[in-house]
């Protein structure tokens, strides 16, 4: 199981969790977080979101095209490993949301 802290404007908003065994993903807002939602599709009022595939909002933070190819090649990341891709670029995303892997 891999986890990543998710920040909105530098404030920790919640955690993204990848359950590789069951091939599922969850995003959970921190109980004390009362800032803006990280996405209009993920309101703060609902504290937990579950996905069968990599969450669309986080997929939208990933590089595409030439930038994706360079990332996969230089970091030796599998094309199907969206979580690792996000960890590689998570602190340098476009917009207010950043992501940082939780060390084991």
Question: Can you say where each PLM-predicted feature lies in the sequence?
Answer:
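Phosphate/dinucleotide-binding and metal-coordinating scaffold of catalytic cores
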Residues: 1-104
């Amino acid at each position: 199981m891999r986890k990543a802290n998710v920040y909105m404007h530098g404030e920790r908003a919640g955690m993204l969790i990848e359950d590789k065994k069951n091939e599922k993903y969850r995003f959970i807002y921190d109980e004390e977080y009362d800032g803006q939602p990280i996405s209009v599709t993920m309101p703060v009022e609902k504290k937990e979101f579950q996905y069968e595939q990599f969450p669309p909002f986080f997929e939208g933070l990933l590089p595409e095209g030439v930038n994706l190819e360079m990332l996969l090649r230089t970091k030796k990341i599998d094309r199907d490993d969206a979580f690792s891709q996000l960890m590689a670029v998570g602190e340098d995303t476009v917009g207010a949301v950043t992501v940082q892997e939780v060390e084991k």
